[in-house]
Amino acid sequence: EEINEIKKRDTLSKKQGGEESVKKHHEKGRLTIRERIDCLLDSKTFDELGVGAGVPVFDDNNELIDFQPANFVLGFGEVASRKVIIGGEDFTLKGGSPNPAGLRKSVYAEQLALQYKIPLVRLHKGGGGAVGGTSQNKNHRPIGEPVFNMSRFYSLAQALGVVPVVTAALGPVAGLPASRLVALFRLVLHGYVMAS
């Protein structure tokens, strides 16, 4: 039963913000975060972490009926045969504004880069805060304590001193994604801000 729920979460997570949201994204000539990651990495090297992270919604019989995935996609991959950690906001989910699981995964990216001493690649496109607040739906289970208790900027500062960090703004950014950009050297190219 638990295995089936994990598989169902994984399937729902891959739908990102839903078919309509992904379609609108494509109609504007834009790629989703998973598509961008696939374009950047060596073919078939992306090993996504935390696919099933997010907020499950259960019915009155405790059956999983919906799932809001973490809006940050994260994983290991290779660029020119070199192992990297790569991640970015999923703009198809509420414009990339962080949900609790997505925020945790975004901070975890820096921790993984430090742990494995490998480059960190960030592809930013998203807001810096959810303006709608948290859901009061009785079918949402509580998230619990954050997996990190330190300042979100602590792991960023550590990573910048230890591993190569490359950050690209691939659309509008605000809040924490924007702060990650300004923490690095910036180079403006054709209307995009890139940092390394």
Residue ranges, per PLM feature:
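Terminal-region recognition feature
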Residues: 1-167, 172, 177, 183-195
